[in-house]
Swiss-Prot record:
This is ADP/ATP translocase 3. One of its GO terms (cellular component) is membrane. It is a multi-pass membrane protein. The matrix-open state (m-state) is inhibited by the membrane-permeable bongkrekic acid (BKA). The cytoplasmic-open state (c-state) is inhibited by the membrane-impermeable toxic inhibitor carboxyatractyloside (CATR). Proton transporter activity is inhibited by ADP:ATP antiporter activity. InterPro entries: ADT_euk_type, Mit_carrier, Mitochondrial_sb/sol_carrier, Mt_carrier_dom_sf. Belongs to the mitochondrial carrier (TC 2.A.29) family.
Amino acid sequence: MTEQAISFAKDFLAGGIAAAISKTAVAPIERVKLLLQVQHASKQIAADKQYKGIVDCIVRIPKEQGVLSFWRGNLANVIRYFPTQALNFAFKDKYKQIFLGGVDKRTQFWRYFAGNLASGGAAGATSLCFVYPLDFARTRLAADVGKSGSEREFRGLGDCLVKITKSDGIRGLYQGFNVSVQGIIIYRAAYFGIYDTAKGMLPDPKNTHIVVSWMIAQTVTAVAGVVSYPFDTVRRRMMMQSGRKGADIMYKGTVDCWRKILKDEGGKAFFKGAWSNVLRGMGGAFVLVLYDELKKVI
């Protein structure tokens, strides 16, 4: 293997391991966030049974669905997250070579910043093309609030993918893809761009204290998450439409979804579950720091 191939493999491994660990740890918060986002578009949750907020959701889930249901959809998320994050990190460095070749970060700060934004956004969009059906399945499984097998919409990851493909074709697994690409570019651009730029401006980036790295990563993750959150809400609402027919279809398309959420629920609805997203973001920040530490070891 060439040195470049070994470096790529190390990036893939370090990114994937870090992601799988952190995602499982924050899975309960992730499920709460998803339920708050999509409950308005769920056929299983009646208007009078909707969750009032994070605390109500955390209290009711174990009572109504069992404690283990907090991890519903987590397997799909870990499977999805391993290639997503690993590909993101690996491609990010390849895109950095394209966008940042020959750029001096000390004398060309804004050119350096723009290159980091572009490489982060391009890496996220590229990865999304490969793993979107897994992201779709994770959302639908997490939104499934049935207690037992007969009450549940899907029995698991495979059942979800098969049922939606039979009903809507492969296209059904890519519902909300366009708005996802828009959101992922905004999120990843901030996530990688600001993080790398901030680290690059430190006196000795390779030997930065882990606490400083974590603080930078935490801030970046929170800012990126809030900025791109409305796009995430719209894409997940669109995902909830797959498998529906006729009068059950709530939104004619992405633009109609934006318009109806704003008209029927108000601007605040775009940010439902956003606070739990910030809490979950601690796991995302941990991924960035853990990735850097793993690369030193591998």
